[in-house]
Amino acid sequence: MRMNDYQLEDDPVTKQKYFRRYAPRKGDKIYKEYKKFFFYSDAFRPLKFACEAIIEKYEDEIFELIAQEANHLADMLCNEKSDLCGTPTNSPEP
């Protein structure tokens, strides 16, 4: 997610601040033209801070999920893709 694709706005009714995406997505017709321009604003900093706070709060859970997925991926690559980690075959002893 590119945080500078969002703009901080105030809700006219509730007066709460929220982020609204103003940048087109890759599939949009105007995307190629839009990418020719460079926008920089400090408005995305609160969103970045909020995302970092969420990551910090759930850091242990995130790493646990990554570790579980890494173990699954290692098993899948070893067993299913390369056939290097199968059960040992009985070979005659010398």
Swiss-Prot record:
The membrane-spanning stretches of this chain are none
Identify the InterPro entries for this entry.
Answer: CNPY (IPR042415), DUF3456 (IPR021852)
Check the record and name the PANTHER family matching this protein: CANOPY FGF SIGNALING REGULATOR 1, MIR-INTERACTING SAPOSIN-LIKE PROTEIN
Member of which family? Belongs to the canopy family.
Question: Which protein, by its recorded name, is this?
Answer: Protein canopy homolog 1
The scientific name of the source species is Mus musculus (Mouse)
Task: State the taxonomy lineage.
Answer: Eukaryota, Metazoa, Chordata, Craniata, Vertebrata
